[in-house]
A protein has these predicted regions:
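Residue-level signal for short hydrophobic patches within transmembrane helices
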Residues: 11, 15-34, 38, 61-68, ...
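Hydrophobic transmembrane alpha-helices of multi-pass small-molecule transporters
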Residues: 64-67, 179-183, 208-213, 283-286, ...
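Helix-terminus/linker motif at the lipid-water interface of multi-pass membrane proteins
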Residues: 30, 34-52, 122-129, 185-192, ...
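Short alpha-helical transmembrane segments in multi-pass integral membrane proteins
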Residues: 1-22, 80-145, 189-243, 299-366, ...
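Interfacial/gating helices of multi-pass transporter permease domains
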Residues: 20, 43-63, 129-134, 194-195, ...
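Short runs within selected transmembrane alpha-helices of multi-pass transporters and secretion channels
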Residues: 73, 142-160, 168-176, 197-210, ...
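Small-residue-rich hydrophobic transmembrane alpha-helices
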Residues: 52-112, 149-168, 273-337, 371-385, ...
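Transmembrane helical elements of multi-pass membrane transporters/channels
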Residues: 20-39, 141, 175, 204-208, ...
């Protein structure tokens, strides 16, 4: 039987294994946000707050399409991890091939759709007229490179599903550094403005995606076995997990677009402040997302290997990591929120922009712990393949956030856009945890565990 050096998720002590696995993913999330924030910081400093607002206005919409990629990767990743843990490498490679072919086609279709309807979508979001043209330009360049972004996210999920989180980190560092230098050259040097920022991101992401694909192909040569290039039945099994995850992630992002539409009427400066803190929220939230993404393959691999006793220990290890990072987030935001806001808003930012950014940021800092425990619990549910309560919990989270923003913010002020966020996280956790307590497999379940569906 083939043995793999990546099997530490099913052999090492749970806290050690999860920490070793999660840390590159956390660092990767940090560099992913540097990669994203480079556009905002450089545009804000060298072009102005209106250009920053144009880039920020695109964030909620681009997140919808990114979440489709991430959700699609979840379906493939859970099954790849399960077969990897069971050492059924033929099925594992069939899932990999089937998902890459299917999602490449999907990414091209989504890119064409996004490019053609960029103006219509930004108009529906009530984007302020003074930044609409720049926002549409940024968005269209983004969609030209969308297949690269989509496939890079799928490949990153594939790497982590087999216990490899270092290669995505190295590629992210490379693309982040490249993106920053190209941003400075195209925006500050050549004066290309929003177009230059978008083009720099496209080129850096494209190079990273190509390298990811070549390295992953080489990595798969380690597992010498027969497999099918495309299997409709495995695609169906994958979609049973992927579709709820895509619905959850894309619906939440659509909800954020609706929230953005609530913010937009408050004006360009309020939008600039909101956009600045959204970037900061993404930095810290992706730390917790990374821990949740790390626990999913841990759970799935150990389930495939029928090591039931390790599941709860892994969940507890994830909670420990979440608590540590929640405390760190609070300390950083409480101490440096003004300086962080100035990175994005620059000298052109008004008092309103700084107030919106600071108030939103400090409120989040108090309650990131709720996001952390929510993400860990959701990650365990994904690893077990229990998607219905996972979807319901996230929809409740979204409903709370949307209802308060839509009803209260227009009447009582922009602060109500973010006041309900922690309540949504907490409700999500409670629903997910209740479902998890009912669904934990035990030692008596070993014989009934299937690699296709738990």
């Amino acid at each position: 039987m083939i043995m793999s050096k990546d099997e530490y998720l099913i052999t090492d002590a749970p806290l050690k294994a999860l920490t070793v696995f999660a840390m590159p993913m956390i660092l990767g999330s940090f560099f992913q946000q540097i990669y994203n924030m480079a556009d905002s910081i450089i545009v804000g400093q060298f072009v102005g707050s209106s250009a920053l607002a144009a880039v920020g206005a695109c964030a909620a919409l681009t997140n919808v399409f990114i979440c489709v990629a991430l959700g699609a990767g979840v379906g493939a990743g859970v099954l790849v991890s399960r077969y990897f843990g069971a050492r059924d490498y033929g099925k594992m490679k069939t899932i990999v091939s089937t998902s890459l072919i299917s999602f490449l086609v999907l990414s091209i279709l989504l890119g064409i759709f996004g490019f053609c309807f960029s103006h219509s979508m930004m108009s529906l979001l009530q984007t302020p007229a003074d930044i609409l043209d720049e926002a549409v330009l940024y968005l269209r360049v983004y969609f030209v490179g969308f297949p690269f972004l989509f496939m890079y996210n799928i490949l990153s999920t594939m790497f982590t599903s087999i216990g490899e989180s270092r290669i995505p980190l190295v590629l992210l560092i490379f693309s982040s550094v490249l993106n920053i230098f190209m941003d400075l050259w195209m925006v500050a040097g050549l004066g290309l403005g929003v177009f230059g920022a978008a083009l720099a991101t496209l080129i850096a992401q494209g190079i990273s995606a190509v390298f990811s694909f070549l390295i992953f192909l080489y990595r798969m040569r380690r597992y010498k076995c027969q497999f099918e290039w495309f299997d409709g039945q495995e695609l169906y099994s994958m979609l049973q997990i992927a579709i709820p995850s895509v619905l959850q992630q894309s619906t939440v992002s659509i909800g954020m677009m609706i929230v953005q539409a609530v913010v937009n009427p408050f004006g360009t400066q309020a939008l600039a402040g909101y956009s600045a803190t959204m970037r900061v929220e993404n930095v810290f939230s992706l730390i917790f997302v990374s821990i949740g993404n790390a626990i999913s393959p841990y759970i799935s691999q150990n389930l495939g290997a029928k090591k039931i006793e390790r599941l709860k220990k892994g969940y507890h290890a994830a909670l420990v990591l979440d608590i540590c990072f929640a405390v760190l987030a609070f300390l950083v935001i409480e101490s440096l929120h003004n300086q962080i806001s100035s990175l994005f808003l620059g000298k052109d930012g008004t008092a309103l922009a700084y107030q919106v950014s600071g108030d939103y940021m400090r409120w989040l800092g108090y309650f990131f712990i709720f996001m952390g425990i929510k993400m860990a619990t959701d990650g365990v549910l994904r690893g077990l393949g229990i998607m219905r309560p996972f979807l319901i919990a996230n929809m409740v989270n979204l409903a709370i956030r949307l209802s308060v923003a839509l009803i209260c913010a227009p009447r009582f002020g922009i602060a109500f856009v973010w006041l309900a966020v922690p309540a949504g996280w907490l409700a999500n956790f409670l629903i997910s945890y209740a479902a998890l307590r009912k669904s934990w497999p035990n030692e008596e379940d070993k014989g009934a565990i299937s690699c296709r569906k738990y």
